[in-house]
């Protein structure tokens, strides 16, 4: 029986990585927030890989942290190994990655929600969204509880009509054996929301006692641990190693012999899977010339023997999986604790959303995470944070927070989803960002903390720490520019020793650092007035000096980009009135409703000629008005 159970400013449906960030942001910005989850023990669940960060994803975590989100702080408290990836490449692609203690990560996030003043956490299944006159009114749960609200954020992950597939065994389920949400999809369809089916998968988990690590390559953590969160100066912890092994000729033979039993190839799987995270059977079919594939053996926590077999997700039948895993060097006696599986689920076409992550046709309804067609914990958390912030800003009748592509990877992520859409689970990559030298993980706080402070998520002590770091970096760069180095004998000897050329005339220390064979750290013996700075401040100064020319070029490109981004398109525009626009362009522009010319130019099917026609039309209208 339906009953009125309470009134909230914001209701968050789902407590995965998107839901947790959305609820915490909403509550910390002063809104009374209800977060509903199918199971209180699955909050911030890592249903697949036991790590946070990695290439481009580490950038997202740093940006979440800079804006006042929780993911970076949570992983800093619960990691068991930390590594900086891509250190042999330029700073634009340096990416922090940490192995998590999955259980502790989840437990700490759950405890944060329980302690947060403005959060009410409930184990409930929402089955219906109540909308009147295109505006959200409330949610109904399976228990009959009805909650009124001003905003709803859908963070349903892979639960909507979830379906587990292992060979020819198919059954209704959420991830990791949890219950699926089978009723909410129909409510969304009734509201006119377009749904689609996507697929993802996860590898088996095996018992550590059954693994022969002597046949594998050990991958320890970095000696110097770099925190994800800018609030942490240093972290120290005994780390647990990961291990690298490879598939064998026998692995490939077993898969080829049983490929007809794979749901991927016999038609059992309808959902579209992630291009950049294929199953092992998909890799072997798609890349027949490769005689082996990397397999990463990763611990799932400090107090468990479970190991994650990274790079070997599968939906093959269980009997085939056993043979397949045991054909990998070091896994000959592997005991499978959890079988690998594929999972299909309902999600939306994200082009139904605007850049705030609110549905265009339903006021107060937002989407975040895998529900929006993305993949990955970090992508989900980033969207949850932005959806939570914007839901509150709208309730408070303030301007929304819309990050541009030149502001953050989060801006690229949301713009790609909303403007371009996606036909497969979307994964963030550094190659998607046009201005990646400006969007480095090391400067995320310098780019975004001011915004986090303005919306109320970054508190005073954190903000003061940020201002101090910013001031230290600026002051040191100014000092280096003004400090002249002359060609004294001892200085030239030092330079020759470093493989550099002698000085013929005075030069600033800042210019000297730019030499390829030198950097801020190497010239310290020439700098007796160097102030005491933190490691991250030193790194920031070094990057700014070394890459100044490239950075300035990208800043010029951003200025060109902003000319289009600043040309706002009137909400009242009728594209049918614009003579010269092609039919496809009219249809796409009507569907996506871009807010500016820049966004319009990135829509697939809208040509440069269409943009020219649109600009001429807007100029004419401006003159008429």
UniProtKB/Swiss-Prot annotation:
Q: Can you list the GO cellular component terms from the UniProt entry?
A: cytosol
Mind telling me which SMART domains this protein's record contains?
GIDA_assoc_3
Q: Where in the cell is it found?
A: Cytoplasm
Entry cofactors: FAD
Q: Where does NAD(+) bind?
A: 273-287
Keyword list (alphabetical) reads: Cytoplasm, FAD, Flavoprotein, NAD, tRNA processing
What does the record give under GO molecular function?
flavin adenine dinucleotide binding
Give me the residues that bind FAD, please.
Answer: 14-19
Role noted for this protein: NAD-binding protein involved in the addition of a carboxymethylaminomethyl (cmnm) group at the wobble position (U34) of certain tRNAs, forming tRNA-cmnm(5)s(2)U34.
Q: Which family does it belong to?
A: Belongs to the MnmG family.
Give the record's subunit note.
Homodimer. Heterotetramer of two MnmE and two MnmG subunits.
Q: What name does UniProt use for this protein?
A: tRNA uridine 5-carboxymethylaminomethyl modification enzyme MnmG
